[in-house]
């Protein structure tokens, strides 16, 4: 919570869980909360993260658009992270890496990094601004440093890498875990800014049409007017 707030989140709605089995109920509770833009959880278990992904997707379909940010386990390799992203494979899920260092300088999971990234996403009001280059505050360091070839692999594999250079921790590039559609490679939703722009445009367009065409009949003239209004709004 502290890291999310420190990096830009204006408020945090938290639900406590006793163990891994309690996450689904927590996600269900949060799914009905309005004005939630980013979701995080305190687990690196892939099954729990899939539940978080599904919660974000279902809430978004119900016009409560949101992004989920997850993390890898302690000491996960590049291959492990790419495999995790492949399992999640959704435009509403961001997998942040590497792991963080704790206060004693020991290697830990990526949960702290994910919380900081979530705060940075929540704090950016312009959806078109890329996440890459965003400075992450409050971290004690990173558990790994990626070479350029590894950064390329991670980004193409749906992982959002973070680096520590010159005493500053920053996001290299913000991407989603969506890399395939069916069995085919698909880069349509790779950039995080793509889904964020969609989430910004669609609600605004929906509100404008609702206000202008309240109780309008489904006629050819009305449909033409709606098309014209959509073009105008875009």
Task: Name every feature range the model reports, one short phrase each.
Residues 1-234:
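Surface-exposed assembly/interface segments
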